[in-house]
């Protein structure tokens, strides 16, 4: 049963000296797994949301602005992605979007936090919409980095739906040169990878470093953005491949591909939106052009807060 609470807030740091307060209207589940603290709650302004280690990871208001932006550009740019690997994405919405594609025959989802996945199955049905029950899904509980380093399968697309690289957190190892080399080793010829890449406005250097690190491994690297109110502004992604280039798709081509290959009605992504996402604002382009650093296991990148 949902629990009604007196006055309470989620206080989320967005940058040094700046935070967002959201009133907690109702808590559905809260506690800690082996890997992270969690809360599934109704929050003022954004509705039902998943909060991990004090940061809003996803909300019912605009989760589709994130998940559709993460998944569809590289899958539509690929000729026909049959096998897809998802690292992270514990709430199931990324797999939900992958399974919309008629080409997809098999999805492997690797998440380290089994407790959180079970909580998502129970409390976040609006997100996964039954995706965990699909015959096409293989759910692997384990370390995403270890999985790709020991990968015996080849995938057409790899989607990295990760938490931010925080100092002391497990995800920083999933944004390094060594990790991206291992990811490339899991791709079939003509394959592509996409990663969430933090905020180009709140952590612009981190966004640029992630782009630069992927550029050390792949010949085609395309940074792009979406707007996610729950994340307090623009949110960044980077697609990478040696052959697949989503930025070359026109609005007309995207709309035709959606009609031909995607089941059901999308709520955020279409051809016009696709073109907008790859047209980065001038300040973001400036940071990308000025930043030379890249991340390694020895020198990882971290979000400021």
From Swiss-Prot:
Binding site for spermidine: 67, 91
Gene Ontology BP, a term: polyamine biosynthetic process
UniProt cross-references to InterPro entries, sorted A to Z: PABS, PABS_CS, SAM-dependent_MTases_sf, Spermi_synthase, Spermidine_synt_N_sf
Catalysed conversion reaction: S-adenosyl 3-(methylsulfanyl)propylamine + propane-1,3-diamine = norspermidine + S-methyl-5'-thioadenosine + H(+)
UniProt GO molecular function: spermidine synthase activity; sym-norspermidine synthase activity; thermospermine synthase activity
Active site positions, chain numbering: 161
Protein name: Polyamine aminopropyltransferase 2
Organism: Hyperthermus butylicus (strain DSM 5456 / JCM 9403 / PLM1-5)
Gene giving rise to this polypeptide: speE2
């Amino acid at each position: 049963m949902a629990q009604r609470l007196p006055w309470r807030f989620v206080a989320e740091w967005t940058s040094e000296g700046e935070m967002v307060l959201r009133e907690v209207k109702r808590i559905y589940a809260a506690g800690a797994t082996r890997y992270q603290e969690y809360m599934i709650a109704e929050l003022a302004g954004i509705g039902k949301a998943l909060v991990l280690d004090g940061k809003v990871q996803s909300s019912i208001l605009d989760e589709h602005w994130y998940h559709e932006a993460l998944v569809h550009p590289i899958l539509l740019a690929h000729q026909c992605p049959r096998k897809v690997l998802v690292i992270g994405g514990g709430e199931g919405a990324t797999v939900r979007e992958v399974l919309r594609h008629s080409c997809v025959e098999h999805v492997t989802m690797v998440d380290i936090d089994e407790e959180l996945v079970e909580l998502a199955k129970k409390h976040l049905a609006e997100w996964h919409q039954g995706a965990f029950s699909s015959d096409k899904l293989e759910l692997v509980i384990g370390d995403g980095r270890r999985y790709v380093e020991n990968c015996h399968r080849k995938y057409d697309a790899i989607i990295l739906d990760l938490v931010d690289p925080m100092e002391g957190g497990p995800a920083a190892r999933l944004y390094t040169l060594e990790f991206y080399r291992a990811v490339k080793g899991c791709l079939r010829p003509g394959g592509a990878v996409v990663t969430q890449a933090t905020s180009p406005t709140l952590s612009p250097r981190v966004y640029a470093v992630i782009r630069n690190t992927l550029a050390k491994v792949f010949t085609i690297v395309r940074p792009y953005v979406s707007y996610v109110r729950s994340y307090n502004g623009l949110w960044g992604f980077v697609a990478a491949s040696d052959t697949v280039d989503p930025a070359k798709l026109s609005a007309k081509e995207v709309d035709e591909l959606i009609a031909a290959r995607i089941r059901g009605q999308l709520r955020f992504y279409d051809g016009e939106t696709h073109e907008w996402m790859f047209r980065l604002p001038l300040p973001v382009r400036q940071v990308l052009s000025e930043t030379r650093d890249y991340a390694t296991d020895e020198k990882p990148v971290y979000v400021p807060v």
